[in-house]
Amino acid sequence: MSNIIKQIEQEQMKQDVPSFRPGDSVEVKVWVVEGTKKRLQAFEGVVIAIRNRGLHSAFTVRKISNGEGVERVFQTHSPVIDSISVKRRGAVRKAKLYYLRERTGKSARIKERLG
């Protein structure tokens, strides 16, 4: 029974997901439905957490919009996501960057990973 579930989940998973880690700046293009119109909306920010659970994998992106911190959780293999592009690689030592929630300005910056 579990082999059937694994096979179905494998078919549902996206193959074109780029590799990114916490600290990386990414741009996620999401399909948004407004009335009868359907358009792409970009959400660009820093990945502060990744949850790896196969088909149920998710990642959290944080950005500052009009001086207010905005976080959004995306399901990695969701059909709502059109594309994910990595803009900048960040050098961090933790898997969860929740400490960025309390920081503002220069203390919230992340060094760029070289190589």
Curated annotation (Swiss-Prot):
Function per UniProt: This protein is located at the 30S-50S ribosomal subunit interface and may play a role in the structure and function of the aminoacyl-tRNA binding site.
Claim: Ribosomal protein is one of the keywords in the record: yes
Gene Ontology MF term list: structural constituent of ribosome
Protein name as it appears in the record: Large ribosomal subunit protein bL19
Alphabetized NCBIfam families for the sequence: rplS_bact (TIGR01024)
Organism: Enterobacter sp. (strain 638)
HAMAP family recorded: Ribosomal_bL19 (MF_00402)
Gene Ontology, cellular component aspect: cytosolic large ribosomal subunit
Keywords, alphabetical: Ribonucleoprotein, Ribosomal protein
Protein family according to the UniProt entry: Belongs to the bacterial ribosomal protein bL19 family.
Gene: rplS
GO terms of biological process kind: translation
